[in-house]
Amino acid sequence: MRIKIPFFGRKSINGANVQVQVYSATDIGLRRANNEDRCVSLEGKDSPGFADAVMIVADGMGGQAHGEVASDMAVEGIIRRLADQPKDKTLPTGGYAELLGQVFREVNAEIYLESQGDTYRGMGTTATAAVVTGTRVHIAHLGDSRAYLLRDGELSQLTRDHSWVAENVEAGNLTLEQARVHPNRNVITQAMGINAEPAVQTKTLDLRDGDLLLLCSDGLHGLAGDDEIKELLQSGKPEQAIKDLIQRAKDRGGNDNITVVIGTVRRQG
């Protein structure tokens, strides 16, 4: 579990300050031999490049130890490219999300190249990243790991699952209940390493005082509904919420690795 001191981000153009505190944990679950999930939670001086805080979840796939290789490559590649950016880099609104999307495409190219060879053939990984700059958070996403925002007691999903069942729910071919038990529920349509040119989702949001950001792998959201997740997030401090979320997934069978990253926000001004 990462527990770090609060950090006040750089001043935005309107003079506001945002305090971000990040927490994370990953658990192998009850059914898997290896943990193929990876996560990052960095803030303040530990954050790479222009970022005031960074949160990443990657859920590897590919059999044997290949999923671990892919998720390692994803988080390391994202952090390395962010670290190459100047600390004082400034971009217009939307520019940071666009840059983060390009970072995802470059890291995907590395993983995709390895996945075409004999050693790591077929490996891939989901990747969801949230990067805080000033008073905004920028998100990039591939796969079915998720980013959520808890604001004013309401939990909203910020990312759209790149999965067969999600696309069929959106098209009206399946209900949410049918999707949860469908035999194709684990089929991913976009991820790092499986497409040469992935369709990276990106977005930018203004942060408000009291916001809570949650990133998680499907080992959590596949076993706990959004209402349950919201209840546990609101029930106590972030450190305890992470423990409770992981335990809830394990109580439901823990059939996958479980990873949770939380960022709490206090905004002044």
List each language-model region with its residue ranges.
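PP2C/PPM-type serine/threonine phosphatase catalytic domain
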Residues: 1-269
